[in-house]
């Protein structure tokens, strides 16, 4: 086989192998995301999280927007922050790479959502983005709520 044909053969082999590896990695990554989502079912299917999503999307519908989609990874981030606020007593934004609404003190999803609706900046957060995550924590009578949007 002449040198040019050998180089062409090697180049084509590498190209095909690279595509196969990339395809396998992509499938593997999709499978990993699916497994992680299933691991978070306890959170995203929780009645309080579902109620927060319902109230959030009712407000979006009221102003003519499509519903936000519940994102399991964002729910986990919001949940971790709500737990942190409840454990530390600090009422502070998390610095996550999302728009974020937090609330401390009110005892129901309705009260937290209404507080966000009545605050212009928080309301604007609710109306932006397509994905949303929620978290909440009650500890020693302290209620902490967190929503993140992107």
Each language-model region and where it sits:
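Secreted/periplasmic proteins
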Residues: 26, 45-47, 51-54, 96-108, ...
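Disulfide-stabilized extracellular recognition modules
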Residues: 104, 109-150
């Amino acid at each position: 086989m002449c040198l040019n044909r050998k180089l062409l053969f090697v180049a084509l082999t590498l190209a095909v192998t690279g595509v196969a590896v990339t395809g396998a990695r992509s499938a593997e990554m999709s499978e990993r995301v699916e497994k992680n989502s299933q691991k978070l079912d306890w959170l995203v299917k929780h009645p309080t999280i579902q109620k927060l999503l319902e109230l959030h999307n009712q407000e979006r519908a009221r102003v003519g927007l499509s519903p936000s989609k519940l994102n399991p990874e964002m729910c986990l981030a919001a949940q971790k922050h709500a737990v942190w606020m409840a454990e530390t007593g600090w009422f502070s934004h998390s610095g996550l790479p999302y728009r974020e609404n937090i609330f401390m003190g009110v005892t129901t999803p309705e009260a937290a959502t209404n507080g966000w609706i009545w605050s212009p900046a928080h309301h604007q957060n609710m109306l932006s983005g397509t994905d949303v995550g929620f978290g909440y924590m009650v500890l020693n009578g302290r209620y902490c709520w967190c929503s993140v949007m992107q």
